[in-house]
Amino acid sequence: MANVVVIGAQWGDEGKGKITDLLSRSADVVVRYQGGVNAGHTIVVDGRVLKLHLIPSGILYPDTTCLIGSGTVVDPKVMLGELDMLISNGIDISGLQLASTAHITMPYHRLLDLAMEKQRGERKIGTTGRGIGPTYADKSQRSGIRVLDLLDEARLRDRLEGPLSEKNQLLETIYGEKPLDPEEIIREYLAYGKRLAPHVVDCTRAIHEAASDRKNILFEGAQGTLLDLDHGTYPYVTSSNPVSGGACIGAGVGPTLIDRVIGVAKAYTTRVGEGPFPTELSGSLNDQLCDRGGEFGTTTGRRRRCGWFDGVIGRYAVQVNGLDCLAITKLDVLDEMDKIQVSVAYELDGERIDYFPSCSEDFARCKPIFETLPGWQCSTAECRRLEDLPAPAMDYLRFLADLMDVPIAIVSLGASRDQTIVVEDPIHGPKRALLSA
């Protein structure tokens, strides 16, 4: 038995969906522990492209239980849309479970999210506009609506009365928006609750029962380390904790239940929205990475900012998450490059540093110090074993493993499941990896 956390080691969009999908074959339970529909992952199965935002990738395996944990925030309309999409594709959803204590994104959360971002003007933070921040804010202020509230009309009315009155006042007087009708909301969300009811469970009890039965549990994070509310590039962050420690809080387990932590990182770096990005490229190189990598957000459709691999934030992700091994994705995107650069340190105000500054203003002044490696200029998309890779590609992977001081367990070379080199099974294999410096 092994219980594994999968996290993003960059700014999200690292390809966690594919890696989680691969690992779900060996998992009995997959738990999404934080975030909401602001995240998105794309999975290609038998030529079908499936885009999910909230439901764990493990739903594609009929014998796998998929649990949306207490640390998530749930937009029931979007979730039910995903369920309908899966059903229309012939996918069994009977294994899906939803924590009764997960918080609900309400209509006023989305309206406030968009209104506040608009009001920030040039100081915008790049929100997806899905209401995630306001939902988590209400959770912290103890005025949120939870899944269990949608199952009881009297309780929903009681919980909604105060928050909705307050939000309507904000919408009208501050943002010039029309107030929301409480009866419409109650009817709509009770209907959502009725459809979701068969999937609602006690999250902590369900996970601990699985652990007692010695089942393999996979904890799936959304977004990435540098978007973590406490450890990321604040204020250009999400409103939850994608780091591995967030799995314990969002799923309701102690740290001793976690056996291994896997970090997922692209062979280069991307970022969506605002915020500092030291290795960001411009011009034709940026366009080449964006076009070859299909770098457009699953959730927003926004074009991602692209840059070279940043070993400084990579080492930081290793430390913050306690990574045991790495999955490197999209190596094939670099196939046509004649040379590849990797940031090994920064220059900050004339001084060389090898750490991630906690102040975003300092981080914005950091200039990358690069090492240049030769490209391989041939296709890796059909490689299925390490020995199939061209020598410069192997050298590049070893360089990353040495730079981050963590071994590589998985290499992804395309969107399809079979476009993968599994150096080591992170769930059933020994606690080691074969690809290191």
UniProtKB/Swiss-Prot annotation:
Official protein name in the record: Adenylosuccinate synthetase
Function comment: Plays an important role in the de novo pathway of purine nucleotide biosynthesis. Catalyzes the first committed step in the biosynthesis of AMP from IMP.
One term under GO cellular component: cytoplasm
Pfam families according to UniProt: Adenylsucc_synt (PF00709)
CDD domains documented for this protein: AdSS (cd03108)
Pathway per the UniProt entry: Purine metabolism; AMP biosynthesis via de novo pathway; AMP from IMP: step 1/2
Organism: Synechococcus sp. (strain CC9311)
InterPro entries hit by this protein: Adenylosuccin_syn_GTP-bd (IPR018220), Adenylosuccin_syn_Lys_AS (IPR033128), Adenylosuccinate_synth_dom1 (IPR042109), Adenylosuccinate_synth_dom2 (IPR042110), Adenylosuccinate_synth_dom3 (IPR042111), Adenylosuccinate_synthetase (IPR001114), P-loop_NTPase (IPR027417)
GO biological process: 'de novo' AMP biosynthetic process; IMP metabolic process
Any one GO MF annotation of this record: adenylosuccinate synthase activity
Residues holding substrate: 298-304
Subcellular location(s) of the protein: Cytoplasm
Binding positions for Mg(2+) per the UniProt entry: 13, 40
Subunit structure as annotated in this protein's UniProt entry: Homodimer.
Manner of cofactor binding, per the entry note: Binds 1 Mg(2+) ion per subunit.
Gene: purA
Binding residues annotated for IMP, in chain numbering: 13-16, 38-41, 128, 142, 223, 238, 302
UniProt keywords, alphabetically: Cytoplasm, GTP-binding, Ligase, Magnesium, Metal-binding, Nucleotide-binding, Purine biosynthesis
Claim: Ligase is one of the keywords in the record: yes
